[in-house]
Amino acid sequence: MASPAFAVNGMFTPVKLSGSFTASMPVDSKPAASATGVRMVVDPLQRKYQSIGKIGVDYSRPKKLATYVRSGYSVGMEFPNTPSMAGHYSLTDCDKAGGAAKILMKYDEYCAKGMLQVGKRAACRTGVYTTKCTEGTQPQMAFDVRVFNRTQAFRQAQKPVAARLREQYEARKACFVLAHNCSREEAQFKEMPMSCATFLASKMEATGACYRTVRPTSVAEDYMAGSVRAQLYTKLNPKGVYGVGACEDGHAKGDADQRRVIALASEYRAAAQSPSTVTGQQYKSAQLATQLFAHDCHHEQEQIYEYPAVAAAMCRY
């Protein structure tokens, strides 16, 4: 008997029986479904040459949106390595910025780093430190200066809100003057305070408009440049006591003496520059001082171009 007489098609699952005493029963041609689902088999050669991100992917599962999870703060601000990049986004009590604000903050940081890199490339075109390098001209001096810059950046962020806002407004005003009536640059400087301060610092370094490198050539010029620097120090410290982040000579024991030695060494080495470099720094200092501080005054312009060291002292940032 091939099958039970009372059996109905589909009522029971046919079972394949094979042996010496039983005949072979008919088997359903439809394959049974796997409990674990269907997986795509990847060829070994394909697995060897495909990207790392595709290995071990379960292709049987549907693809979901936003399944990639990145650990950490995706658009967090890095620790500033220069004082010009510090203290711009900590002016409020709220430390949780919105999504768009975080992206714009990171974009401002990216632009500021690019401006700083461009300025350093202009200052050292051949990739070798010159006599006017701000990071040092002796072994291990660059490391000490970088540590000092990071410390100064940390203290810059601790300044009062009023002091930091005043510095931001002054930097924005100077950048507007140097933008040459370009609406695109003015819009960028208006919305990006970190780019403003870094643009000024990198421009002064690239052009050499610094009182450390532009040396006075007469007693009168030396006296006037010293008077300008004294006025700037009085503006930073009206009470005669260095505040948090205001002192540029040091913040720990021994820093002040080391910074003064570095300053005197830079002034001494500035005299070893080529005549064309010295003339270019004097001209750039006078040009920037005329644009930023002369106020279309003929008398001030004559003094600035006659005494380049005074112009360099006015341009210090």
Swiss-Prot record:
UniProt keyword list: Antenna complex, Bile pigment, Chloroplast, Chromophore, Electron transport, Membrane, Photosynthesis, Phycobilisome, Plastid, Thylakoid, Transit peptide, Transport
Principal location listed in the UniProt entry: plastid
Domain of life of the source: Eukaryota
Membrane topology: Peripheral membrane protein
Residues the record lists as binding phycourobilin 1: C94
Protein name: R-phycoerythrin gamma chain, chloroplastic
Binding site for phycourobilin 2: C133
Entry PTM: Contains four covalently linked bilin chromophores.
Subcellular location, record wording: Plastid, Chloroplast thylakoid membrane
Function: Critical for the incorporation of phycoerythrin in the phycobilisome complex.
Oligomer status and interactors: Heteromer of 1 alpha, 1 beta and 2 gamma chains.
A GO cellular component annotation in the UniProt record: chloroplast thylakoid membrane
Residue numbers binding phycourobilin 3: C297
Transit peptide: 1-40
GO process annotations (BP): photosynthesis
Annotated positions binding (2R,3E)-phycoerythrobilin: C210
